[in-house]
From Swiss-Prot:
Keywords: Toxin-antitoxin system
Pfam family, one: AF2212-like
Protein task: Possibly the antitoxin component of a type II toxin-antitoxin (TA) system.
Organism lineage string: Archaea, Thermoproteota, Thermoprotei, Desulfurococcales, Desulfurococcaceae
Disulfide bond residue pairs: none
Record-stated family: Belongs to the UPF0165 family.
Parts of the chain that traverse the membrane: none
Keyword check for Lipid metabolism: no
Name of protein: Putative antitoxin APE_0472b.1
């Protein structure tokens, strides 16, 4: 079992790192903590994710 951080956008949890090892598996999610994030940083981060970049190193989210 591993701990994965993510962001919620429009009701969907977006992981902050690729989850290729979980592809096709059913998972159970437990929310331990919730923090607010800067909307401008979030938009830039999500744009890079859509372009296929690993954006975690660029932003402190």
């Amino acid at each position: 079992m591993s701990e994965i951080e993510g962001i919620v956008k429009s009701g969907v949890i977006i992981p902050l790192k690729p989850l290729t090892e979980l592809e096709g598996k059913k998972i159970k999610i437990k929310i331990v903590d919730a923090e607010s994030v800067d909307a401008e940083k979030l938009y830039s981060y999500l744009r890079l994710l859509r372009e296929g970049e690993d954006a975690r190193d660029f932003f402190k989210i």
